[in-house]
């Protein structure tokens, strides 16, 4: 690299602008082509006399002989040599070369074909025939030689000779294409009987469904439908009735049915389809069934179409279940499909047995979920319920339906979980059979094995329908002994006692309920208070509120307490339909409740609850109070202020938040700033009220006004405006 001359480097292009004249790739190629030097061509030699010809031929033969001497196994060299001799009209020499080549490789198909082509070009027909005889004798499994031989004879209009060649060929039992060529030869010369005989020999040699169908189609096309039926019947007898053979012969059945359809023999076609489908499993006859469905849609009645669609869907569901036997959705679909088919047959007046439906249900319930988890059993249990409903409603086999319920109950692992819907369905089945004692035994057994709220509730609902109130009370006692924390159960029991107007028992039940550790005690207290309020017992309701406030001082309790004091209790209608006026409420008592609630929430520092209480108090004063009390409450309403506090993540940074600021809290925390703030607020309101033309008052409020500003802030502002 160090010794390279710097002048050898390519010049650096300084001007990168495009040239004025652009040169295309096409121009470059054209110039390159034009500048190429002409290739050297060998001089042409002309043969002037026989002596020169002999010399030329001798030289060429020497070259060919030298070439085949060094590459004796090269068939291409032998072929070129022989073809050159033939081009010199030296056919004897050409034959000699071909024979010498055949001695080297007598099984070269290409060599035989080139040899025969040479004889045919020289119009030596007999020589070519002799060569074809030798070739097919030596190579009988090479179809190309047979085809060329037959083509030669037919080209010479020697049909009998071509037939003889085919006969020799058929003795070797060639492939189907050879048989078809023989048949087409006979068809070209209208020898249909001979062609039919060839079909028969072909079938004897290769009895596969495709060949049977081709033979029958040939007979149909030449106007022999009876012969075509005979062919199909022979084929079906040959294949037999075994499942494996029928599966193999599906194409024969389909072609047979299509032929009958073309001949307008629809009943024959339907029988053929049904015969084949009855001997094949659904999973192996999808294609045949699709053709049958299409046939019924075109030529069948409504019942036939429905039957085919039913079968097609049945195959689909069976395939899904074969892949996953625990696919209960597929079992449901298959069971409903069979039920619909059973009902349709009964509506048509047919005497059918429900065996297929029962078989589906038995197969379905045999696939028990693999895990003892309720989520896997939910869909499975519905199979049993649907099975029992089918036996009860459709077949009217009540004993079998009872057996289904018993089997389902026995199968469920009740120690782990149970299904109340199963027990209740079983019990209501016994009720429909007018056996109340059996229904009670079923539900009692369910509660004894695995008690659960839904089972108790269903049993109680049953007894309520039967108007057995003593049994209902007993069941509620057992229910609440099992789980005394269920608030809904206590409330339902009181509703039952209220319906029979046993109010003392209702109060006793409520008293027991509020003493328990309930899951939702608030709804029990609310129901208790609503009951007393509904009966017009204001004092009892007031006592309940006081007891509840001892347990919790939630803002909703205070609001509800206050609204109870203002509400009218005990109204309604008597037995004669006359309206009874209730006891009117007392607004002062309600206001005192609001004040108590506000003070209690303020003491506990519940700002949001105080704001909610004040909003309810404001609504109360708007409806039941006067302007003075409304103004007082409005002065107590909080305002929102933006404040800062340290972040909770411990980073020391300040974060912004909105806080509720109550006037009484501000006054108590900083009286001086509160007075100033009140004065500024009054000044702002005064300025907004008077506009630019009015004068402004800078008088601070007096001490007496300051003391009462929580009560009459708005009145103070009005007085200040009047003084101005």
Curated annotation (Swiss-Prot):
Main location: nucleus
Residues covered by region (Disordered): 681-724
Top-level division of the source organism's lineage: Eukaryota
Gene Ontology biological process terms in this record: spliceosomal complex assembly
Biased composition (Acidic residues): 702-724
Swiss-Prot/TrEMBL HAT repeat ranges: 55-87, 89-121, 123-155, 157-188, 190-221, 223-262, 264-298, 308-340, 352-386, 396-432, 434-465, 467-499, 501-534, 536-567, 585-626, 635-667
Alphabetized Pfam families for the sequence: HAT_Syf1_CNRKL1_C (PF23231), HAT_Syf1_CNRKL1_N (PF23233)
Family stated for the protein in its record: Belongs to the crooked-neck family.
Record text on subunit structure and interactions: Associated with the spliceosome.
Family matches, as PANTHER family: CROOKED NECK-LIKE PROTEIN 1 (PTHR11246:SF3), PRE-MRNA SPLICING FACTOR (PTHR11246)
Record function comment: Involved in pre-mRNA splicing and cell cycle progression. Required for the spliceosome assembly and initiation of the DNA replication.
Protein name in the entry: Pre-mRNA-splicing factor CLF1
Native species: Cryptococcus neoformans var. grubii serotype A (strain H99 / ATCC 208821 / CBS 10515 / FGSC 9487) (Filobasidiella neoformans var. grubii)
């Amino acid at each position: 690299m160090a010794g390279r001359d710097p002048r050898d480097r390519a010049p650096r292009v300084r001007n990168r602008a495009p040239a004025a004249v652009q040169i295309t790739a096409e121009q470059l190629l054209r110039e390159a082509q034009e500048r190429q030097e002409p290739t050297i061509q060998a001089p042409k030699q002309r043969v002037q006399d026989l002596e020169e010809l002999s010399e030329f031929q001798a030289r060429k033969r020497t070259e060919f002989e030298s070439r085949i001497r060094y590459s004796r196994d090269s068939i291409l060299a032998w072929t070129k040599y022989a073809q050159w001799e033939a081009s010199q009209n030296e056919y004897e020499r050409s034959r000699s070369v071909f024979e010498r080549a055949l001695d080297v490789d007598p099984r070269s198909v290409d060599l035989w074909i080139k040899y025969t082509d040479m004889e045919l070009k020289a119009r030596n027909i007999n020589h070519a025939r002799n060569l074809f005889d030798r070739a097919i004798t030596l190579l009988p499994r090479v179809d190309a030689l047979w085809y060329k031989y037959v083509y030669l004879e037919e080209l010479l209009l020697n049909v009998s000779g071509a037939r003889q060649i085919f006969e020799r060929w058929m003795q070797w039992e060639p492939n189907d294409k050879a048989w078809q060529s023989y048949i087409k030869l006979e068809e070209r010369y209208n020898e249909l009987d001979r062609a039919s005989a060839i079909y028969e020999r072909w079938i004897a040699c290769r009895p596969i469904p495709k060949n049977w169908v081709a033979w029958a189609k040939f007979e149909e096309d030449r106007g022999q439908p009876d012969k075509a039926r005979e062919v199909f019947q022979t084929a079906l007898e040959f294949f037999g009735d075994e499942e494996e053979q029928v599966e193999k012969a599906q194409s024969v059945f389909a072609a047979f049915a299509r032929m009958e359809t073309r001949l307008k023999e629809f009943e024959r076609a339907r029988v053929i389809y049904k015969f084949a489908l009855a001997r094949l499993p659904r999973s192996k006859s999808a294609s045949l069934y699709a053709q049958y469905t299409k046939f019924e849609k075109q030529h069948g009645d409504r019942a036939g179409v429905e039957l085919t669609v039913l079968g097609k869907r049945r195959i689909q569901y069976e395939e899904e279940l074969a892949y996953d036997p625990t696919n209960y959705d597929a079992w449901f679909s298959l069971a409903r499909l069979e039920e619909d088919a059973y009902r349709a047959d009964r509506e048509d007046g047919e005497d059918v047995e429900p065996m297929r439906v029962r078989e589906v249900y038995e197969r379905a319930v045999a696939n028990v979920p693999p895990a003892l988890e309720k989520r896997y059993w939910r869909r499975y249990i519905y199979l049993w319920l649907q099975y029992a409903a089918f036996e009860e409603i459709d077949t009217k086999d009540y004993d079998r339906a009872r057996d289904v319920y018993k089997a389902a109950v026995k199968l469920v692992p009740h120690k782990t979980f149970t299904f109340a819907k199963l027990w209740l369905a079983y019990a209501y089945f016994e009720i429909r059979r007018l056996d109340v004692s059996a229904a009670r035994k079923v539900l009692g057994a369910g509660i004894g094995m695995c008690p659960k709220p839904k089972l108790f509730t269903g049993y109680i609902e049953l007894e309520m329908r039967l108007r057995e109130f003593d049994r209902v009370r007993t069941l509620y006692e057992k229910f609440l002994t099992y789980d005394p924390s269920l608030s809904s159960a206590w409330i339902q029991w009181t509703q039952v006692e209220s319906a029979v107007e046993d109010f003392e028992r209702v109060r006793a039940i409520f008293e027991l309920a509020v003493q328990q550790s309930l899951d939702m005690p608030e709804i029990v207290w609310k129901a208790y208070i609503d009951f007393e309020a509904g009966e017009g017992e204001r004092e009892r309701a007031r006592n309940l509120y006081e007891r509840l406030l001892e347990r919790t001082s939630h803002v909703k309790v205070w609001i509800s307490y206050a609204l109870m004091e203002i509400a009218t209790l005990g109204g309604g209608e008597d037995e004669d339909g006359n309206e009874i006026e209730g006891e009117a409420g007392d607004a002062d008592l309600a206001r005192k409740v609001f004040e108590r609630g506000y003070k209690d929430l303020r003491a506990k520092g519940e700002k949001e609850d105080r704001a909610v209480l004040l909003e309810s108090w404001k609504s109360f004063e708007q409806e039941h109070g006067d302007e003075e009390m409304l103004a007082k409450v409005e002065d107590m309403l909080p305002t929102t202020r933006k404040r800062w506090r340290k972040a909770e993540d411990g980073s020391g940074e300040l974060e912004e938040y909105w806080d509720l600021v109550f006037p009484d809290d501000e006054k108590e925390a900083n009286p001086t700033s509160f007075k100033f703030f009140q004065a500024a607020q009054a000044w702002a309101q005064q300025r907004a009220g008077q506009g630019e033309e009015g004068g402004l008052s800078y008088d601070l409020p007096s001490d007496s006004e300051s003391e009462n500003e929580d009560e009459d802030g708005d009145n103070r502002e009005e007085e200040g405006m009047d003084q101005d």
